[in-house]
């Protein structure tokens, strides 16, 4: 078996929701593969694992054929991460690897080569690994550890596994602005959601002015600024404003936490965005900025093409925790239409407001409930 190489596809709970998968080859068992990535992705999901004599050729061919779907890494190189529906990716793999088994655990264990059994086995292992780690993190009492000393040990790569978990919890609590009084149930919920990816929270902090940048500009920051300019431009055109910066308070409408956009205003705004927005003015460049497939939309000459544009606008806003969706169906003068709502992601908003509560109005009713929920 040592002479065999497996072709694999992996993802995580977060990436699976974003239709993002990593392809590669591996010498060894499935357990070896899980151990290899467990440090980086505690919630790793193995979608496909197949021993084949032409694994290297399959990997090389797919990477070449799927160039336009591959994500560019921070160094500007194409990575092995692919954005594509798994069903489509799987069908492309099946063209290269002729086998009836989706996943093979070990060629010597013929009684384990049933896909349903293997899928269930891997699913249980993934779930147990994540759940166990979260329970370990919850049980850690940070007050019993000297974080500064652990950070020094980390710099010289001398941490044991327990100390690594202590620092993992410390940085998680810090990034979300949590303290030791938070209830286990709430902490478990947040760990499940944000332990391995806090990008959404970071983006919210930057977009709405909670986090003040202090580091010198670099390529990454410049790209982030360009993306934020695009998001602000979209919001302005949707609600008819000219904001240069956004705060999440603009989405508050009395006691409601969303802005209502009437059907006529919405249709006018979509047309304006298609014709004049920063994003669509230079669509090919901006697609790369948001890790989308190269190309351009066709002119919005019919209802179907306008729906495609609207979907892209929704996706762009969603990437920065802003939700644009139909709100209520109305009928006026015999014509039916929708009103639309524009709001921020409530959970991320609450996390960030709790983190920066010292600079917010603490007499706000929602803020008081929030502080209680987070054990403050």
UniProtKB/Swiss-Prot annotation:
Pfam families: MUG113. Belongs to the mimivirus R1 family. This is Uncharacterized protein R10.
